[in-house]
Amino acid sequence: MKPFRWSPEKNEALQVERGVSFEGVVVAIGSGGLLDVLAHPNEAKYPHQRILVVAADDYVYLVPFVEEERFFFLKTIIPSRKATRDYLQGSELDAED
């Protein structure tokens, strides 16, 4: 797998504003937290972006990224209640049956 890169300034802002970091996302991916890779819903505005769906600390985050020739560039981290419901709570209900 290609390495991940990101903007240090954006990473610092995410830590302050949302309490999450790109390092945490990469650790979660490395420990099996990658749940899905989606096409960006607005391909016209973001033609080369896709979205990583990552589980970390019992929550799901959407991480838009651009695949470069030698690395993946992570753009931001979006906490998602809807993705948490769809990816984690649905699997918890399945496990109870």
Regions found by a protein language model. Name each.
Residues 1-97:
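Ribonuclease/tRNase effector modules and their secretory precursors
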